[in-house]
UniProtKB/Swiss-Prot annotation:
Organism: Bhanja virus (BHAV)
Source species taxonomy: Viruses, Riboviria, Orthornavirae, Negarnaviricota, Polyploviricotina
Annotated stretches, region: Golgi retention signal: 480-522
Site description Cleavage, residues in chain: 560-561
Cytoplasmic compartment spans: 479-536, 1045-1070
Originating gene: GP
Similarity annotation: Belongs to the phlebovirus envelope glycoprotein family.
Keywords of this entry: Disulfide bond, Fusion of virus membrane with host endosomal membrane, Fusion of virus membrane with host membrane, Glycoprotein, Host endoplasmic reticulum, Host Golgi apparatus, Host membrane, Host-virus interaction, Lipoprotein, Membrane, Palmitate, Signal, Transmembrane, Transmembrane helix, Viral attachment to host cell, Viral attachment to host entry receptor, Viral penetration into host cytoplasm, Virion, Virus entry into host cell
Record-marked site positions (Important for glycoprotein C and glycoprotein N subcellular location): 1068
Biological-process GO terms, alphabetical: entry receptor-mediated virion attachment to host cell; fusion of virus membrane with host endosome membrane; symbiont entry into host cell
Keyword Signal: yes
Protein name listed in UniProt: Envelopment polyprotein
C-alpha cells in the first residue's frame, strides 16, 4: 500500500514540479541523458525517470525535526523506519527483517518526493516536494545498489537459499547506499556542434585512463578493469538532441549573481509559525509581500503582509572551466560513478625460452635465439659480467681472443627476448687447464711460458735472436746508407760553400780597388795593392751512432687462489677432554691479504699428533663499493590538481568578513570534494573582484576558494637512494661447526661472529671525492625495473613507504607546496605544476652507468660500485682473531698414504694450482698437505679418496716436496709439473665489470715470475752458473752460427773450385 502511494507521488512529481531545481527533465529526457542509467539491480527501478532517481533532497540535520513534527497527528508512524539522521543511510527495518530488497530501496530513492503536509490530501494536485529543497536549490541524491552479498553474520547462518536473512539471523549493519552526491541545476543555452566536440575531446584528455562511466564509453581500451566507485565532478550541457556530460576529478567553478530570479527568494507565511516548514506562499510574491533589503531593492515591499521573502543565498549562475575556456552548464554537481579503467597490458608470466641456446668454445661465447630476437642479455664468466641490449639481433657472440677460461669455468647467461620469454643458460667452457689454456701464437701468454713447448722453445729462442740480429743488421745497413748519402752530398755542399766564399772575396776586392782609385785620384798618390792569403778550412768529422736494444717480456698482475690456513701445534694450546676430544685455542692472528669474490678460506688448528680441527669457512661473496645512505624514500610521478570556486560576498561560505571568516569545512562544502583531503593538499582563499561587473550584487570583494593537491598519476612507485661517502666493503658468509651467518664488513670495521672476530681493512682513499647523484629504482612485482640517476632533483614527493607513495597519502608523504604555484587573476585562479617527471628521467642516465673507473649499478636493492679495466686490484686484508674461540679437536690414529696424480693450473693467478691426489685412509677424518708457501685441508673417508687440493707456488716449473699429514701419520710427497704464468681471464668485453680484489705487493713479488726469469729457469736451470753460461751462449750463438755458416760456405766453394780446375787445364792443353 505504501509503495503504491509513493509511486503515485513520484509520477506526479515528474510532470508537475515546474520550479523544482532538481528536475533535469526541464532540459533533457531520460533516454538521452548520459551517466545516469540505473545502477540498481531491480527491474522496477529502470522505469523511473531521471528526476525520480536523483531528486532526494540534501536535508542532513533537518530530517529528524521534519519527521518528528509530522508524526504528531499526521499518521506518519509507518514511515519511521525510513528516518535518517545523516546522509550515510544505514538501511531500514525492512532490510534487516524482510527477505525482499525492492521496497526499501525504492523508498529511499523516493524519500525526497514525500510532501508530509499534503500526505493523503489530494496528492495528485499538489507539488510533492519539500520546501527545503526549493529553499536550498541544491539537491542531494543517492544511488542505491542491493542486495550486497549477504546481510547475515556467522558464516551466513540464518540465510535462506536465496541468500536473504531470516528471523534466526544475527543482523548485519547493512549499507545499501553506494553513492551520495549534490547537484545544481540552472538555465543554460544549448552548445553548438563545435563546442560539443571541444568538450568531448577535453573529457577524453582529462580522463585518459577511464574506459567507461556508468556504461558510457569515454576512451577505447584493450582491457578494462572490473570497475569501482569513484567520486567525479560533472557538468551537463544541453544539445539540440539530448545532452553532453563533462566529467573530471575536479572542476574549477565561477559563480556569478546576475538578474536574480524569483526562485532565489524564499517566501513563507508569517501568520502561522508552527507550520513554517509546511506552508510556503502558494504563489510567487508580488508587491504585496514584505522582504529583506535585497528583495525590496528588486521588488516593492509592503510593511504588513502575510508573506515574507528572503534571499536564500543562492550560488548564482555557475560557469565551469574546460581546458582554457569557460562554459555555462545546465547542471553541475558531484557524484560517485561506477568507473571502469584501462588496465595496462602486462606481460604474461615470463615463460622459458625453449629456442634459446648458448655455447662456449675456444673462440668464445655464442648466445642465439631461433624464434625471437634477443632483448637484453647479461653474460658472466670468470667473475666478469657484460650486459648488452640487443638491436634486432638473434645472436650475440663474444670472442675470447688471446685468452681462454680456466678449467671448469662455467658461462652463465640471463636475459629476455622481445616476446617476453626469459632464459637462464649455462655452458661449460671446456676442461683446459695449464698450458692448454694458451690458444694463441707469438702472443704474450706463449712467450711467457716456454715450459709449455720443451722442444719448440729452442727454435723460438733462435727465431727471437735471429730477429734481433736482423733488426740490428737492418738498422746498421740503414745507417750506412744514410752515411753514404751524406758522403755523396758532402762534395757538392763543400763546392757550393767555396764558390760562395770566392764570390764574396772578389766582390770585396773590387770594392776596395774602387775606393783606392778614388782616393788616388784625390791625393794623386798610388799605393801598391795588398793581396790577402786565403784561409784554409778543416774537414767536418762524421758523427758516431751507438744503438741500444732492450728486450723485456711483461706479464699482467693476477689474483690469488683459494687457500687453507693451518695454525701449527706450537701456536695452539689444548686441554684434554673425554673421548680423546681436546679443547684448543690460539692467540695467533691470521691475516689474509689476497682476497677475491667467490674465494673460500679455511682456517684449521693443529692439535696433538697433528690432528686437525673442523675448519672455519669464510666465503667471500663480493667485494664492492657501498655507500652510507643519507636518505631512502619512495616517490611517484606526481599529478598536480587545482580546483577553484569563486563566490560572491554574502553567498554560500563567503560571509561578511570574506576570506577571513572561512574555515576548513567551508572549503569542503564549496569545492565538494573530500577525497582530495586524503592527498597532500593546500587550501587558500583569495579576494576576487566584486560588483555588477563581476556578476555580484555586492561591491565587496568576492571569495575565490582554491584547493591544490597532488595525486599519483599512474600508480607507479619509485625508491630513491641518496648516497654520501663511498667505501669498499665485503659480504662474507662464516660457517663454523655450530653456526652460520652472513655479514657485511666495510673498510675499517670489525665484527664478531660465534666468538671469532673479523677485521676488514682496505684503501680508504679509493673513492675519495666521488660524488654520485641520487639513484632511483622502480618498485615492481614482476619484470625488470627501471634504474637510473635522478639528475634533476626538482620538486617531487617523498613518502615513507611504498603503499603511501602508491596512494599519495597526505599523512605519510611530504610535498612542497611550491610544487603547484597559483596565479590569482580577477575572478579565477590559474595553476602551474613544478613537479618533475620521475619516470621521464629513466632515459637520460639509465643504470648501469660508468663513473670514472667504476661502474655503478643496483645489486640486491642497493647501489654498488664495480671495478672496470685495471681498477679492480687494490690493497686490503682480512684479519681473523681466534683468541676468544674454543675449538674442539678429536685426536685419533688415522693413517693415510697418497700419491700425486697430476698438477695443473697457473702461478700468480686467481684460481692458482690444483693438485689431484689419491689418498688411502684407514678411517674417516681430515688430512693436510703442506708445502713451502701454502697448505691444503682435506676431508677423507675410509678407503681410497680422489681429492683436489688448492695450492700456491712461486715458479712455473714446480719440483717440490710437500708433507701429507693425518692424525696418525706423516708422509712426504713429491710434486712435479708445469704451470703457466698468468692464465687469468682479463676481460670479457670492453665494458665488462667485476668485483674488486685485494693482493699483497710483497707476496706478489715472491710468487709472480717474470717471463724473462721463467725463460732462464726453463732453458738453463735454477743455478746461477747455468744462467750465466746460458746467457753468454745465447748472446754468442748467433755469431757462432754465422761463423759456422761462413765456414761451410768456404768449404763448399773451395771444393767446387778444385773440381773445376782439372777440366780447365785439360781444355787448355787440348
Amino acid at each position: 500500500m505504501m509503495f503504491s502511494r509513493v509511486m503515485q507521488l513520484a509520477l506526479i512529481c515528474a510532470v508537475t514540479c515546474e520550479d523544482n531545481p532538481c528536475l533535469w527533465e526541464r532540459f533533457t529526457n531520460s533516454r538521452d541523458i548520459e551517466f545516469m542509467i540505473p545502477v540498481v539491480n531491480l527491474s522496477t527501478s529502470r522505469r523511473l525517470s531521471m528526476s525520480q532517481r536523483i531528486c532526494m533532497v540534501s536535508m542532513g540535520k533537518h530530517w529528524s525535526r521534519i519527521f518528528s513534527e509530522g508524526e504528531e497527528d499526521r499518521g506518519m508512524k509507518d514511515l519511521d523506519p525510513l528516518l535518517m539522521s545523516s546522509l550515510n543511510w544505514r538501511g531500514t527495518a525492512k532490510t534487516r527483517s524482510s527477505n525482499s530488497f525492492n521496497f526499501d530501496i525504492l523508498d529511499g530513492i523516493f524519500l525526497g518526493f514525500l510532501d508530509l503536509v499534503k500526505w493523503g490530501e489530494e496528492a495528485d494536485r499538489h507539488t510533492p516536494i519539500h520546501p527545503e529543497c526549493i529553499k536550498s536549490k541544491v539537491c542531494g541524491f543517492m544511488t542505491a545498489s542491493g542486495p550486497r552479498i549477504k546481510t547475515c553474520t556467522g558464516k551466513f547462518r540464518g540465510a535462506d537459499r536465496h541468500g536473504h536473512c531470516t528471523n534466526r539471523a544475527t543482523p548485519h549493519e547493512a549499507t545499501n547506499v553506494i553513492s551520495v552526491g549534490v547537484q545544481h541545476a540552472q538555465e543554460a543555452n544549448q552548445v553548438d556542434e563545435h563546442e560539443a566536440r571541444y568538450i568531448s575531446e577535453a573529457r577524453k584528455s582529462i580522463n585518459p585512463e577511464i574506459c567507461s562511466i556508468d556504461g558510457v564509453e569515454i576512451n577505447q581500451c584493450d582491457l578494462a578493469s572490473p570497475g569501482r566507485w569513484l567520486m567525479l565532478h560533472y557538468a551537463s550541457f544541453r544539445l539540440q538532441e539530448g545532452s553532453l556530460v563533462y566529467l573530471s576529478p575536479g572542476l574549477n567553478i565561477k559563480w556569478s549573481q546576475i538578474n536574480v530570479p524569483a526562485s532565489d527568494f524564499y517566501c513563507i507565511n508569517v501568520s502561522d509559525h508552527l507550520n513554517t516548514h509546511y506552508r510556503p506562499c502558494e504563489v510567487n510574491c508580488t508587491d504585496n509581500c514584505q522582504g529583506d533589503e535585497l528583495y525590496c531593492s528588486v521588488h516593492q515591499c509592503a510593511r504588513s503582509a502575510e508573506c515574507k521573502c528572503s534571499f536564500i543565498g543562492s550560488r548564482g549562475m555557475a560557469e565551469v572551466q574546460i581546458g582554457d575556456r569557460w562554459f555555462k552548464p545546465a547542471v553541475v554537481g558531484s557524484q560517485q560513478f561506477f568507473v571502469k579503467e584501462d588496465v595496462p597490458v602486462l606481460q604474461q608470466p615470463s615463460a622459458d625460452c625453449t629456442t634459446c641456446s648458448m655455447t662456449c668454445t675456444a673462440e668464445g661465447i655464442a648466445i642465439s635465439s631461433i624464434k625471437d630476437e634477443l632483448k637484453d642479455v647479461t653474460v658472466c664468466v670468470e667473475g666478469f659480467c657484460s650486459t648488452r641490449v640487443s638491436k634486432g639481433s638473434k645472436v650475440w657472440k663474444i670472442e675470447f681472443h688471446n685468452q681462454y677460461p680456466s678449467s671448469g669455468s662455467v658461462a652463465l647467461a640471463r636475459g629476455t627476448t622481445v616476446s617476453g620469454e626469459t632464459f637462464e643458460l649455462t655452458a661449460e667452457c671446456g676442461r683446459r687447464t695449464g698450458c692448454e689454456q694458451i690458444n694463441c701464437l707469438f702472443c704474450r701468454e706463449m712467450l711467457s711460458n716456454p715450459q709449455c713447448y720443451p722442444y719448440g722453445k729452442w727454435f723460438l729462442l733462435f727465431l727471437i735472436l735471429a730477429t734481433l740480429y736482423i733488426i740490428v743488421a737492418l738498422l746498421k745497413t740503414i745507417m750506412r746508407i744514410f752515411m753514404a748519402c751524406l758522403s755523396v752530398l758532402y762534395g757538392p755542399f763543400i763546392i757550393i760553400i767555396k764558390i760562395s766564399r770566392c764570390l764574396g772575396r772578389l766582390g770585396k776586392r773590387k770594392g776596395e780597388r774602387t775606393y783606392v782609385r778614388l782616393m788616388e785620384a784625390l791625393d794623386d798618390e798610388r799605393k801598391p795593392e795588398v793581396v790577402r792569403a786565403p784561409v784554409s778550412l778543416g774537414r767536418t768529422k762524421q758523427p758516431r751512432i751507438v744503438l741500444f736494444i732492450v728486450l723485456a717480456l711483461l706479464v699482467h698482475m693476477a689474483l690469488c687462489c683459494d687457500e687453507s690456513r693451518l695454525v701449527e701445534e706450537t701456536s695452539v694450546t689444548c686441554n684434554p677432554g673425554p673421548d680423546n676430544i681436546f679443547s684448543c685455542s690460539t692467540k695467533e692472528m691470521i691475516t689474509v691479504k689476497e682476497l677475491r669474490a667467490g674465494k673460500t678460506i679455511c682456517v684449521s688448528l693443529k692439535g696433538p699428533g697433528g690432528s686437525l680441527s673442523s675448519p672455519i669457512k669464510i666465503k667471500m661473496l663480493d667485494i664492492v663499493g657501498r655507500s652510507d645512505l643519507l636518505d631512502i624514500y619512495f616517490t611517484f610521478n606526481g599529478h598536480a590538481n587545482c580546483k577553484s570556486v569563486r563566490r560572491c560576498r554574502w553567498a554560500g561560505s563567503c560571509g561578511n568578513s570574506g576570506c577571513l571568516g572561512v574555515g576548513k569545512e567551508d572549503y569542503d562544502r564549496e569545492l565538494g570534494d573530500q577525497e582530495s583531503s586524503l592527498h597532500p593538499n593546500w587550501r587558500d582563499c583569495y579576494d576576487g573582484c566584486g560588483g555588477a561587473a563581476c556578476g555580484c550584487f555586492n561591491a565587496a570583494p568576492s571569495c575565490i576558494f582554491l584547493k591544490r593537491y597532488v595525486t599519483n598519476a599512474d600508480s607507479r612507485v619509485f625508491k630513491v637512494f641518496k648516497p654520501s661517502a663511498w667505501f669498499l666493503s665485503t659480504k662474507i658468509v662464516v660457517e663454523t661447526t655450530s653456526h652460520k651467518e652472513d655479514v657485511t664488513l666495510k673498510s675499517g670495521e670489525a665484527k664478531v661472529i660465534d666468538k671469532v672476530s673479523f677485521h676488514y681493512r682496505t684503501d680508504k682513499n679509493l673513492f675519495a671525492g666521488m660524488s654520485i647523484p641520487p639513484i632511483v629504482t622502480e618498485v615492481k612485482r614482476e619484470g625488470k625495473p627501471l634504474s637510473f640517476f635522478l639528475e634533476n632533483q626538482g620538486q617531487h614527493p617523498k613518502c615513507k613507504d611504498e603503499n603511501s607513495a602508491r596512494t599519495s597519502s597526505a599523512s605519510n608523504c611530504i610535498v612542497d607546496q611550491n610544487t603547484i604555484s597559483a596565479n590569482v587573476r580577477v575572478d579565477d585562479v590559474s595553476c602551474r605544476s613544478n613537479l618533475v617527471s620521475i619516470s621521464g628521467m629513466s632515459t637520460l642516465k639509465p643504470l648501469p652507468q660508468r663513473v670514472g673507473d667504476f661502474l655503478i649499478q643496483l645489486h640486491n636493492d642497493e647501489p654498488v660500485l664495480l671495478a672496470t679495466g685495471d681498477s679492480g686490484v687494490v690493497e686490503g686484508e682480512l684479519q681473523i682473531d681466534l683468541s676468544h674461540k674454543k675449538i674442539s679437536i678429536k685426536v685419533d690414529t688415522t693413517v693415510c698414504r697418497g700419491t700425486v696424480k697430476e698438477l695443473k693450473g697457473c702461478v700468480g693467478c686467481t684460481k692458482g694450482a690444483f693438485a689431484s691426489l689419491e689418498i688411502h685412509s684407514t678411517s674417516a677424518g681430515s688430512a693436510s698437505l703442506q708445502c713451502s708457501l701454502s697448505s691444503c685441508y682435506m676431508e677423507v673417508q675410509k678407503g681410497v679418496n680422489n681429492v683436489n687440493c688448492s695450492l700456491r707456488f712461486s715458479k712455473a716449473v714446480v719440483e717440490e716436496t710437500c708433507v701429507l699429514a693425518c692424525s696418525g701419520s706423516k708422509e712426504q710427497l713429491s710434486i712435479k709439473g708445469n704451470l703457466i704464468i698468468g692464465g687469468d681471464f682479463k676481460k670479457l668485453t670492453e665494458d665488462s665489470a667485476t668485483s674488486f680484489s685485494h693482493t699483497d705487493s710483497k707476496d706478489t713479488r715472491i710468487h709472480l715470475q717474470t717471463g724473462l726469469m721463467n725463460w732462464l729457469d726453463t732453458l738453463f736451470g735454477a743455478s746461477l752458473l747455468g744462467k750465466i753460461l746460458g746467457i753468454g751462449l745465447a748472446i754468442l750463438s748467433p755469431f757462432i752460427l754465422i761463423l759456422i755458416l761462413r765456414w761451410i760456405l768456404r768449404v763448399v766453394l773451395r771444393r767446387s773450385r778444385i773440381r773445376r780446375e782439372p777440366k780447365y787445364e785439360m781444355a787448355k792443353y787440348s
